[in-house]
Amino acid sequence: MAAKEVRFSDDARVKMLAGVNILANAVKVTLGPKGRNVVLDKSFGAPTITKDGVSVAKEIELEDKFENMGAQMVKEVASKANDEAGDGTTTATVLAQSIVTEGLKAVAAGMNPMDLKRGIDKAVIAAVEQLKTLSVPCADSKAIAQVGTISANSDTEVGDLIAEAMDKVGKEGVITVEEGQSLQNELEVVEGMQFDRGYLSPYFMNNQENGTVELDSPFILLVDKKVSNIRELLPTLEAVAKASKPLLIIAEDVEGEALATLVVNNMRGIVKVAAVKAPGFGDRRKAMLQDLATLTGGTVISEEIGLELEKVTLEDLGTAKRVVINKDNTTVVDGAGEEEAIQGRVAQIRAQIEESSSDYDKEKLQERLAKLAGGVAVIKVGAATEVEMKEKKDRVEDALHATRAAVEEGVVAGGGVALVRAASKIVDLQGDNEDQTHGIKLLLRAMESPMRQIAANAGAEASVVTNAVKNGADNYGYNAGNDTYGDMLEMGILDPTKVTRSALQFAASIASLMITTEAMIAEAPKEDAPAMPDMGGMGGMGGMGGMM
């Protein structure tokens, strides 16, 4: 086992604070509408330019092991805020730096670290309650667009695009961000349920120009097994042919004789038919087939529940207004399922999301929920260069997370105003002893730090701005974008309550741990092994006299 180096008390804390400051100073320059860019070197390709706090934090790794521990703990603050609310990473970092700096000064002055921590915790609980009372619901498109704009570093186009996407697919809908092909940002909305399976044979195609299969008012047969024997499908095909309607078969697979017969029937015009594989795998496939059944008003034909393919009647088939299939995707538009059944299924999936502990499962369940409830919107980010594209895509994703958070818990005045107002409401809060009260005061001072940093980045005098805002009331604050004061909500400068709350809670949590640190242990740096000694000259061989 490698030797370890141990540092105690002030010796440890000074090193830790140095690491905190290096990381926080690099991150905090990005805060606010006039925040600066940070350039990140990449081992290959062009450097990345970003204004995203968590991207900057993730790049930082320090040589000194003890300083690095401090930096990594603040990096954790940014990551946690990002995971929880998708934004507020820079705010969280600025708060953490302020709490740690002030807290370690108090510890060095002889205060009890545990009492300081208790005071900080007490103040956080009170401040979060105040933020909740300051919160305003975020319901209309205008407010959603404003939140998106602020989070995307004052890019109004991004805010409007996200608001339009939410308008079209609903609050529950899935909105994804992709790299586009043009210079402009684009929004593409897929209505109905789309899944990533295309036609099983190109011979099903009936729109050669677009390379798609288009079925109007088709019957939909859902089968939870492989179909290879055409005899199993004959009763269904005959019934559908009599009804003179197209048929879509969604099964685990359709192969061999069954697929060949379907293709021949389709080409001869006996029955208009298409077949696709069911989406997903294993249990997820079963669940998605059931979703399709609920959406189209059909029944999943599964031998597990005693239903056989040969005995299918038209009542077992689902229907939809229109189905479009290309080589990669199938879209079912306007399924004929009952609204009540769909809402029941939606509620069931919501309950599963609440119970799930896996992020991957949650994401997949959220996708299923969106496909049932609204639809899917894709924001295609346009840019002139790849470097710009990456930076822009990061910003759009941030803005999307922020708007979701705003819809969830409402919004508060932006620009650090909400934290200052919440702090002013709990200024009389007292601890059980003097050290706890100092912990409370320390947090209240730290809650001003995001506003101070926004003002400093905009080239204003931080103390002047903070005093002016403190003397105002309600949502009165400083607009760093155009260097004016006024009502932040009216000016459209909003922060999601969830983002502000998460930033404060995570910053205080990790900063408290750092204040109460008494020892640090890291691997001792290895001594460089000395180089091999110089062998010097080999010397002469001397006279080898006497040799004949």
From Swiss-Prot:
Q: What are the binding positions for ATP in this chain?
A: 30-33, 51, 87-91, 415, 495
The residues forming a coiled coil are: none
Q: Which GO terms describe its cellular component?
A: cytoplasm
EC? 5.6.1.7
Q: Which reaction does it catalyse?
A: ATP + H2O + a folded polypeptide = ADP + phosphate + an unfolded polypeptide
A GO MF annotation of the entry reads: ATP binding
GO BP terms, alphabetized:
protein refolding
Q: Main site of residence?
A: cytoplasm
Function per UniProt: Together with its co-chaperonin GroES, plays an essential role in assisting protein folding. The GroEL-GroES system forms a nano-cage that allows encapsulation of the non-native substrate proteins and provides a physical environment optimized to promote and accelerate protein folding.
Q: Which HAMAP family match?
A: CH60
Protein name (Swiss-Prot/TrEMBL): Chaperonin GroEL
Q: Which organism is it from?
A: Pseudoalteromonas atlantica (strain T6c / ATCC BAA-1087)
Its lineage opens with: Bacteria, Pseudomonadati, Pseudomonadota, Gammaproteobacteria, Alteromonadales
